[in-house]
Amino acid sequence: MEFRIHLLKIILFLAIAFEFLSIKAFATELNNKIKFEIKASEKLEWYQLDNKIVALGNAEVKSNLFKINADEIEGFYNGQIGKGKIKKLIAKKNAAFKSSQIFINSNYMEYDLEEEILIVTGNNISMTSNLGSINAQKSLVYEKSKKQIFLEGNVLIELKNPNSKIYANRLIISIDEKENITLVKAIDMVNVKLDELQQNIFSDEAEFDNLKRKINFKGNVILNQNDSTLKGNNAIIDFEKGLSSITSTKQSSVTGVFY
């Protein structure tokens, strides 16, 4: 009897060990160019007919370029496991994407590794970067090859320097090779609040150049400061010079420049 119990323990131990080793092996050899490591606190499921791996419970996919965490992550691959490569990742519930300079959170995201496009959807999307924090209520698309990020749906970006807020329906962000934000373009129902200058500006479009430290406003510009209101077609806020200017092509409109 004791011998049977002892034998069962050995078999159980070997089964657990073999399962762990096999999971670790295919989880780290899914891509023959970029190595991935897939972890999960509950279990990893391998659907061979669908070429799919599912990680459940505190799931994590990690490479030398990025990391994705979520309650559940699905990985789709081409070819045979260990010889093929992952082509797509889907993260569900409490999903988080992290690269060198960009952190994105939402309840759902898809990452096309072949096209290098991250698609994030949901009504509570957040992103942080070297520039500040951003929130959106519809979608975020990060096209790495184009070095651009597109956000849509009641977008709010809170800048660290200068201390200000930009509201818009859509936002287009340009980044450099190191993922630092260089340019932010706000489109549709734009409202910019500049705390340091005590200005509140409305326009059709606004473009913040992080390198030149300027914001350019275009179309139906309304600049409010204290009790003063100025209207025009274009405006520029130069943070380096501490200069605000508003101009218009209409002769009847007021043009003002003040420090």
Describe the residue ranges of each PLM region:
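Bacterial N-terminal signal peptides
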Residues: 9-22
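N-terminal secretory signal peptides that target proteins for export/translocation
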Residues: 1-6
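N-terminal amphipathic/hydrophobic interface segments
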Residues: 25-259
